[in-house]
Amino acid sequence: MFQCLEPERNEEAGLVYVREKGKLSVIGSHSSELRTRPCRLFSKGFSVELCGKQEDTSKHRQKPFIFTYTKEGSLRYSAKSLFTLTLELISDNIQYVDSLMGFPDQIAEKLFTAAEAKQKFYAPCSGLMALRKFTEAYGDLVLSSLCLRGRYLLVSERLEEIKSFQCLHSLDLSCCKLGDEHELLAHLSSDPMSSLTELYLKDNCLSNIGIQKMTASVRVLGRGLDKLKVLDLSSNPGITDRGVCFLFGFKLLKFLDLSDTSIQDPSGTLKKIETKIGLVLSKKSIFQFDHTNCRTQGWAEQLLEQWESYILSAIKPKDTLKSRNAAQQFYGKEKKQIPSDSGTFTLPAPVVQKQTHLQFFRPKEQKDPDSSNSEKRRHSTKRTGADCVQEDCSIAPSTKRPRVTLTSSDWDLLNSY
């Protein structure tokens, strides 16, 4: 009876588990060991992708390291310097910089090149703001000479950017079709253009009214283009003898070109120019008016080329002429050609004006001690209005800070970070 009750007790009690030496076993079962699988949080094929803040995928993000190859041909990873990373960060946000006054010129040039490579000067509003940060702080380093000869499309499309350039020494606006009412002509008499020493306005449809507006600040206030030494007004038929009188305010003028204008009394005009300014007529062509040495110089030299190429690429060539001819041939409306022998009407020949050579230069002055002493006495007793204005300008403190330059040791220290 004991044997019969034992299996019933075993069934009621259930399985008995025993752990021995870290192994779990069941008493009285055929499988002495239970295989326990490790608990996995994820399956083998599970992968995790970290998604951060969504950014603009159209912009290529530069990685903070550089790929280079060694002499053996193996690929080498080198991290960018802290200076390079900082330069890229500032160039990406150059329009938000308050001012660049006081920064060294070498760093500013690298920053300008980096911003130009990122096309930060192309945007209509932010590009102009970024460009003004450099022109206000560095002046003629951005551009000292600007040649816009025949580039009237660039003048019309980038007028505000051109007006932002300060401390220019040479400006060539020949063949730009400005006219008397152009905004850039009025800008020439402003204070930012007072550093101009060479100005070329050949073939711009100027008249006496435009010359009067351009020289108003010099004649009345004694400032503006008061440092001008070379002036080219040739090929402007609207300039007459009356317009020449407005040029007498340029006391430092050394070279003047009035060729192909509408001067009716050359002999009388020559006498006025010689007595008022001290210029005499040159029998030979003056090399200053050959336009061979005039070119764009400064940090923004490549920027102007990119502007012009962008404007020219936007202008698509007109292909309507071929389609128009094809349509005329299809409908049988070809253009009638008038035979040469049956000409009942002939166009008059264009009137060719006689070219006049009127180039003036200042001869070398011979020093006369008596005349110099008398001139000094006259200036000591009487002060002119222009002298007062110049004295006031000299007393006024300059707004621009002195430029800071880095030495070779400073560059070594900067590149070591």
UniProtKB/Swiss-Prot annotation:
<feature type="compositionally biased region" description="Basic and acidic residues">
    <location>
        <begin position="362"/>
        <end position="375"/>
    </location>
</feature>
<feature type="repeat" description="LRR 2">
    <location>
        <begin position="195"/>
        <end position="215"/>
    </location>
</feature>
<protein>
    <recommendedName>
        <fullName>Leucine-rich repeat-containing protein 42</fullName>
    </recommendedName>
</protein>
<dbReference type="InterPro" id="IPR039631">
    <property type="entry name" value="LRRC42"/>
</dbReference>
<comment type="similarity">
    <text>Belongs to the LRRC42 family.</text>
</comment>
<dbReference type="InterPro" id="IPR032675">
    <property type="entry name" value="LRR_dom_sf"/>
</dbReference>
<feature type="repeat" description="LRR 1">
    <location>
        <begin position="167"/>
        <end position="188"/>
    </location>
</feature>
<keyword id="KW-0677">Repeat</keyword>
<keyword id="KW-0433">Leucine-rich repeat</keyword>
<dbReference type="Pfam" id="PF13516">
    <property type="entry name" value="LRR_6"/>
</dbReference>
<dbReference type="InterPro" id="IPR001611">
    <property type="entry name" value="Leu-rich_rpt"/>
</dbReference>
<feature type="region of interest" description="Disordered">
    <location>
        <begin position="360"/>
        <end position="390"/>
    </location>
</feature>
<feature type="repeat" description="LRR 3">
    <location>
        <begin position="227"/>
        <end position="248"/>
    </location>
</feature>
<feature type="repeat" description="LRR 4">
    <location>
        <begin position="252"/>
        <end position="273"/>
    </location>
</feature>
